[in-house]
């Protein structure tokens, strides 16, 4: 008896193994979207948690997650940072694996309110699912101030995280501005004024007076930062409008042009004269007088400081964050004041000699300011064109730095020149792909002549019009990476084209994922893309010939020989 049971188990196992060995290579090995991305939610008054349990080997796109309330008001949703994923057609994208928990704060929800959640993911094997939409019913929530209070903090943190550099960069910018031709030569004079012309002060006393002067200057800048941040907070939504972003980008570009010497930005000379006379009336050498001198000095903008200061102020207005606004301008003023403190304590011997290098520092800050328009325009024009703008800026900066370095005569500068030249060559790569890769891609995508269909009725009509010929239906979408790989690498192959010469070629573009697309995918029982279906001369599909997932030209050609009806 035991021997019979053992024999039966062995036969069952053998059947399973052989079934796996001879399984159709094109047959779908992928699970439905609800199993790949198990979605759930839980609400507790104002707090709603959305969770996705992501199956191993699958991932969700961060940028494809959208939440739309109906008869409800929610706080801005802050998506957590994902991990970077890169492919040939879409570049770098942030994705989520394993598990995603997304907290949503509900400020107010009426009876019958809902939340529409849209998301999309793919499998590592190259299989992508259409966007999934779930409707989350919400319990009634009454608006109150306590629930809305954390919203501004979260929103500020979100905008802060999206900005291109941290406030600590302001300290480095301030130090760099100190070495421009408009500022550095003034430091010995300012030092003498701060000390009141007294040459025999102790080091501690001199350091204290200079520190007080810098704090007075920093106070002016900090107050300015707080005012601009408060104004930005009131108009935060407007500051994200494409037209406003384009306008700000133009302003930043003009500020950068002033750093390149095309024109001069500064306060009117009459106002500068009044502020200077007011500062000169203060008594140098006394803490109170020195503090007032510093505060007034913060209002006197030289041509070298106006553009960077304006850029930082616009940066702060974008953030709408009060802490960031005050802190950034304080660190900026502190950076400008550090060289002054060193000169006051140690004397002019620490000052580098004036020369053309100071103009080069000013020009370098022009390139730094140019990075801000690129950052703003990237939100409007998209990642692809944004990368090209970054590429152009990188080529311009490294090219300028390389040409400037050719004037140096020291041997070690040759190493720097090689590094700068290599950086310029690396930066130009996205522009090369744009200039020389687009035409080739367009050509390869026209090799197969597909007839486009949209609905189930159009598919049935096309099958009738095939008049006994075999039919291949390619389901395509712009968000499907493997679909683009099929077009570029597989459908362009001469062997594949030859094998499909007598086949009617149909293609359904389901990028929009509208009602007609959903109905077509449901009718064909398609889980995701890429999926290629084969029909015989009678219009009947051969399920065993169905292809899911990417195949290279050689594998697909073999599949056509073995499977095509």
Swiss-Prot record:
Pfam families: DsbD_N, DsbD_TM, Thioredoxin_2. Disulfide bonds join 122-128, 182-304, 480-483. Keywords: Cell inner membrane, Cell membrane, Cytochrome c-type biogenesis, Disulfide bond, Electron transport, Membrane, NAD, Oxidoreductase, Redox-active center, Signal, Transmembrane, Transmembrane helix, Transport. The chain crosses the membrane at residues 163-183, 208-228, 243-263, 296-316, 323-343, 357-377, 384-404. Residues 1-19 form the signal peptide. It catalyses: [protein]-dithiol + NAD(+) = [protein]-disulfide + NADH + H(+); [protein]-dithiol + NADP(+) = [protein]-disulfide + NADPH + H(+). One of its GO terms (molecular function) is protein-disulfide reductase [NAD(P)H] activity. It is a multi-pass membrane protein. InterPro entries: Cyt_c_assmbl_TM_dom, DsbD_gamma, DsbDN, DsbDN_sf, Thiol_diS_interchange_DbsD, Thioredoxin-like_fold, Thioredoxin-like_sf, Thioredoxin_CS. Belongs to the thioredoxin family. DsbD subfamily. NCBIfam families: PRK00293.1. Required to facilitate the formation of correct disulfide bonds in some periplasmic proteins and for the assembly of the periplasmic c-type cytochromes. Acts by transferring electrons from cytoplasmic thioredoxin to the periplasm. This transfer involves a cascade of disulfide bond formation and reduction steps. This is Thiol:disulfide interchange protein DsbD. It comes from Shigella flexneri serotype 5b (strain 8401).
